[in-house]
């Protein structure tokens, strides 16, 4: 059972091709492997017809919960951003194994595999589906454990854990790429917006169990302090 497409594939194809002809990227909501595969086929056709999108613009897929193994390489090949929400992976403990079986579960939320294939990951919270706390996102990504229960011990599919530096990159540069705003956001550089948060600890040096204890000391937008503890 592949579920029901919200938008008919032929209609989606017409939207993507029309956008590609004008040089515009498209973001598609794709949860399961059938949706991901269909969207990548459309992006591939658009690229063949009209060439790569202009510099700084990338198509994006949202959620990408379980993959067909043959699609794992295609995101990087087609320069598609994978916008994912790490806390989703533990919303239904035991559910993936029950519904999909052990073979298909191996390709669920495969962050390590995607990064090893040079895919651009973009992190977000997907609030209100999960909590808006960004530290929960980082905790889930590096531990593969639920931010509320801290289960399972050792992490779910622990081989797909990523490092904190990689998680921060996904939450900054990756998210800027998903928004098509890498010239303005994602890194601290001359000429970009000075949007940043000051934290009470170095996330690159702290233990995974301490990530969620992090407090924001100050927030700056455009170089202006808009919050201070």
Language-model-detected regions and their locations in the chain:
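Active-site gating/metal-coordination segments in enzymes
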Residues: 1-13, 64-66
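His/Asp/Glu-enriched, well-ordered alpha-helical/loop segment
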Residues: 17-27, 34-59, 64, 69-73, ...
């Amino acid at each position: 059972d592949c579920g029901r497409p919200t938008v008919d594939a032929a209609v989606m194809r017409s939207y993507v091709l029309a956008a590609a002809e004008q040089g515009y990227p498209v973001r598609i909501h794709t949860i399961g492997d059938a949706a991901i595969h269909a969207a990548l086929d459309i992006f591939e056709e658009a690229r063949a017809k009209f060439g790569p999108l202009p510099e700084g613009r990338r198509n994006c897929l949202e959620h990408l919960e379980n993959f067909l193994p043959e699609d794992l390489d295609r995101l990087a090949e087609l320069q598609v951003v994978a916008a994912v929400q790490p806390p989703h992976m533990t919303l239904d403990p035991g559910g993936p194994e029950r519904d999909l079986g052990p073979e298909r579960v191996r390709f669920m939320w495969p962050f390590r595999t995607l990064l090893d294939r040079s895919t651009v990951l973009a992190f977000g919270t997907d609030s209100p589906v999960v909590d808006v706390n960004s530290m929960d996102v980082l905790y889930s990504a590096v531990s593969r454990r639920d931010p509320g229960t801290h289960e399972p011990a050792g992490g779910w599919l622990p081989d797909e854990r990523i490092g904190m530096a990689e998680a921060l990159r996904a939450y900054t540069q990756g998210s800027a790429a998903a928004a098509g705003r890498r010239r303005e956001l994602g890194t601290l550089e001359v000429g970009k917006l000075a949007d940043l948060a000051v934290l009470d600890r170095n996330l690159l040096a702290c233990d995974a169990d301490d990530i969620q204890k992090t407090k924001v000391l100050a927030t700056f937008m455009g170089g202006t302090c808009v919050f201070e503890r």
